[in-house]
Amino acid sequence: MAGSSLRQVAVFGATGSIGASALDVIARHPERLRASLLSAGSKVDELLALCATHRPAHAVIADAALYPALRDGLRALGLATQAHAGAEALDALASGDVCDTVVAAIVGAAGLPSTLAAARAGKRLLLANKESLVLAGELLTRTAAAAGAEIIPIDSEHSAIFQCLRSCDASRGVRRVILTASGGPFRGRDRAALAAVTPAQAVAHPKWSMGPKISVDSATMMNKGLEVIEAHHLFGLPGEQIDVLVHPQSLVHSLVEFVDGSTLAQLGLPDMRTTLAVGLAWPERVDSGVGGLDLLRQGRLDFEAPDTAAFPCLRLAWDALRAGGTAPAILNAANEVAVSAFLQGQVGFLAIPALVEHTLTTLPRHNADSLDTLLFADAQARQITERALAHHALHA
């Protein structure tokens, strides 16, 4: 990016933790970055507060019933920001000239349409919505390639691989990539101990500040399983070339092993502002507000194999990747329903992988030849998981 050009950034999911980190980086560089569009799901008061601070040209609330509150709130603040509501408005703005860069941070499958719209329009896509890749990875990467869109991953692990691969012409020289995992807050516990885990315990991640759904995914290691599927789509690698290592310090974010015996790794403090700064300024580097890594102070780096017996979600994700077609979409949808039920206290922690496995084995796999096919598989998986939940409630 030329130093004199102003990058117009849309932040989808602005009221979440990734949105907050993105806006922090943007605010540090007013001479080169501007938040031109902010969106939120239903947190209209938080969205208004962000608009007052960042003064975007446009603000979108997904819940159309909250449009009057957004419109009137912007007027009361004396802002020229235009109010919009609904998914169609967001998709249209993502496709238009309001932005050249999109931070896709809407949680869950709800983020897919706007992510696809941005890709279709050839935008730089800072992808934090992992469900877009898991649900429709082939479609998204194909769409981006056809439109000349640039996908830069924001997950720390995929950003690390992106940075390592961009350091050389490595298109044919990769032996494998190794995703690191913190192990979550319950690393080392057996299934008997995991049965007693509460939602409050599961959302308290020891290293990263994240929303509740992603925190639970980290606790079950489904987060890492989804990242394996993402890495397959982002970097064109089969599952056999994607490994996972538990690294509790969360300082080595991922590694790339090359055929010549070299291994490159990217290290840094666990802070999403680093990867967002990479995506916003690439190929340049800008201050993210994150300090440097003091290895002497850290003292040690530990690595261990993941325990897939205690945390079967990682195994289920590999199973879905090997099955291909609609299987990853089924995995993702079942997990969203199961995690939501756990957070609401309807089921225990160990019910999450059990429900996901039930749905994966119940639904037949089909070729993922269109978005409609994928969305139908998503809807079917949700119905089957909800039915299994109702059965669980009756027999609890």
Swiss-Prot record:
GO molecular function: 1-deoxy-D-xylulose-5-phosphate reductoisomerase activity; manganese ion binding; NADPH binding
Pathway stated in the Swiss-Prot or TrEMBL entry: Isoprenoid biosynthesis; isopentenyl diphosphate biosynthesis via DXP pathway; isopentenyl diphosphate from 1-deoxy-D-xylulose 5-phosphate: step 1/6
Catalysed reaction equations from the record: 2-C-methyl-D-erythritol 4-phosphate + NADP(+) = 1-deoxy-D-xylulose 5-phosphate + NADPH + H(+)
GO-annotated biological processes: isopentenyl diphosphate biosynthetic process, methylerythritol 4-phosphate pathway involved in terpenoid biosynthetic process
Alphabetical list of InterPro entries matching this protein: DXP_reductoisomerase, DXP_reductoisomerase_C, DXP_reductoisomerase_N, DXPR_C, DXPR_C_sf, NAD(P)-bd_dom_sf
Pfam family, one: DXPR_C
UniProt binding sites for 1-deoxy-D-xylulose 5-phosphate: 130, 156-157, 182, 205, 218, 223-224, 227
Family annotation (Gene3D superfamilies): 1.10.1740.10, NAD(P)-binding Rossmann-like Domain
NADP as UniProt keyword: yes
Cofactor dependence: Mg(2+); Mn(2+)
Residues that bind Mn(2+): 155, 157, 227
Enzyme Commission number(s) of this protein: 1.1.1.267
Residues annotated to bind NADPH: 15-18, 41, 129, 131, 211
Keywords: Isoprene biosynthesis, Manganese, Metal-binding, NADP, Oxidoreductase
UniProt cross-references to HAMAP family, sorted A to Z: DXP_reductoisom
Functional description taken from the UniProt entry: Catalyzes the NADPH-dependent rearrangement and reduction of 1-deoxy-D-xylulose-5-phosphate (DXP) to 2-C-methyl-D-erythritol 4-phosphate (MEP).
PANTHER family, alphabetized: 1-DEOXY-D-XYLULOSE 5-PHOSPHATE REDUCTOISOMERASE (PTHR30525), 1-DEOXY-D-XYLULOSE 5-PHOSPHATE REDUCTOISOMERASE, CHLOROPLASTIC (PTHR30525:SF0)
UniProt record similarity statement: Belongs to the DXR family.
Name recorded for this polypeptide: 1-deoxy-D-xylulose 5-phosphate reductoisomerase
Natural source organism: Xanthomonas euvesicatoria pv. vesicatoria (strain 85-10) (Xanthomonas campestris pv. vesicatoria)
Origin organism lineage: Bacteria, Pseudomonadati, Pseudomonadota, Gammaproteobacteria, Lysobacterales
Gene it is expressed from: dxr
